[in-house]
Amino acid sequence: MTNKQSNEDGTLSDEEIKWLVRRAKGGFSITTTAAANVTEHGRGWDGEMGVWGDHQLPGLTKMATQLNETGTVSLAQIFHGGMRAPQSINGVQPVSASVNTEAGMDGLYTRELTHQEVLGMIQSFTDAAVRCQKAGFHGVELH
């Protein structure tokens, strides 16, 4: 699920926060954010929220606080677009765990991650989870 309301730098807009808080006020026992990207160059679409940088913490904290005030369990859904991260949005060739023999987004083939890049991706997910915890979310969902 996504609503494409975040800013270009992955920070949350007030509209996006209000949208999700309305869901929580409706009585959902668990409220999960839209997919939030763990790296700047792994976005799957425009208007996607991010959790890759500390500059995103103020909005994430605002969202988590407002969600938690409703009594819902708040989760941030963290992910990387991988082979579905268009070069037209990210400016880099899409990546994957292995070579992809079929053209992906924008008609391009994906590039296989190196071992060091896989380790870096794991660290990006870890950093994003810690950032979400600092913001006040109850947990994360790995997408």
Each PLM stretch: what is its role?
Residues 1-143:
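Flavin-dependent oxidoreductase catalytic cores
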